[in-house]
């Protein structure tokens, strides 16, 4: 199991994870959603029963299934719809900036420069 965990520590990108676990992926989906996919994957991992008590093959299989599930979420949906990150949760996908707030920020920016 230690070997499996050490190998995971060497992975640095979403593509690295997908390749390591043998999950086929569309690069277009990865270009748009790579951070969202990894965040969802780690959310799924946290929801699972403790996996550290199983052997490496069971862990690999469970991790692969969760990564595949996370990737699938973004094949059929968008990051804004999935609301993985706080910015999407708080604004419900909408942004609202009033002209008054823009005007108020202008002199502050000019003075700061």
UniProtKB/Swiss-Prot annotation:
Keywords: Nitrogen fixation. It holds the Pfam family NifW. GO terms for biological process: nitrogen fixation. InterPro entries: NifW (IPR004893). The keyword Cytoplasm does not apply. Transmembrane segments: none annotated. Signal peptide: none annotated. The keyword Repeat does not apply. Belongs to the NifW family. HAMAP family: NifW. Homotrimer; associates with NifD. This is Nitrogenase-stabilizing/protective protein NifW. It comes from Polaromonas naphthalenivorans (strain CJ2). The lineage of its organism: Bacteria, Pseudomonadati, Pseudomonadota, Betaproteobacteria, Burkholderiales.
